[in-house]
């Protein structure tokens, strides 16, 4: 790659770096905002509908996390091959990613559709009849969308490995707009209720998959995948993808199970605490989403550095993006904190819920800029270098010790309110940050060999 005049030779110029990272950050922010708008529209259908959507989405998020993890494995392999300038192997890896992720998604869809009702009863137990009916409808449509989510994730990861992050962002934004417009038409126009929301989601996901596969066929792309029906499994490359994707998938899955355990504890604290925690979760997600986008983009950057044999560059860009992420986190935290009271007021929260929410956001705004970046950003680089098992073990250990166990003890034994959730979270972030910092400077994470 070219370098800017007077600069030390780096694989990426600042211009190239921002061109890669900014679309990923924008995509993450818009997806989060669109998701919030989507939830608000569904909430107008009624309490049974919003309860059903909330319950089913706890399953859907877990499935989507699995696809995202597999896609991340494909991104790492394709990025490293692109760093080697080995387009042929990058293309072969892309084909295998599309094959395996689609196959897994189809199997999941068949299982979820065939065993739809028993699965819902097994996971959620006894719920109100109306909620269960709505859950069955919503789950059916969303399960049908699994292959399309998987294909879009795979296609997007391949484009990101080619440093084209603008196309996945554009497709995602259009898809979210389609989903909201579809909700408006089907929910409010045709009065289809939860089925309208689910159908709109299915259509938007089909759109994503078709468009990303269409552009991936273009001969202009360095990684060009054509004749999808002729793709045959390559056990070696599939094993490479799964070796990276499965540990990340376990890590993401454990996070979702931990989240459910925390929700179960918070639900014992009363309605005001539940509402306060729900709003705090939304606001905390907003102040961190831009930095997460930087981390996702960093995986592609470090993957190329490792593939090119430039381990020094992997270290350089990790440090650089940690600094950028720190600035972004500080600005995001201050901005969201400034909007907290207006949002509490507009959300119609009770005085008690609003007070608890503001108290928790105050501490998040103080603590997050100090401990969040070292707890998460270096981990993206380590995964891109193939150091996925360390991340999985550390993340699962700190989550169950701090986020879950400490939270439960503080709530149930010492009578803490919802702030216990965030004490557990801060402890988790702090421990992660310490161990990731030691791992990063020890440089063992650079010794993994992902590709030949």
Question: Where are the regions that the model predicts?
Answer:
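Short alpha-helical transmembrane segments in multi-pass integral membrane proteins
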Residues: 1-24, 78-145, 189-246, 302-368, ...
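Transmembrane helical elements of multi-pass membrane transporters/channels
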Residues: 19-38, 141, 175, 204-208, ...
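Small-residue hotspots at the loop-to-helix junctions and early N-terminal turns
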Residues: 47-58, 135, 139, 198, ...
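Small-residue-rich hydrophobic transmembrane alpha-helices
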Residues: 50-110, 149-168, 274-340, 372-396, ...
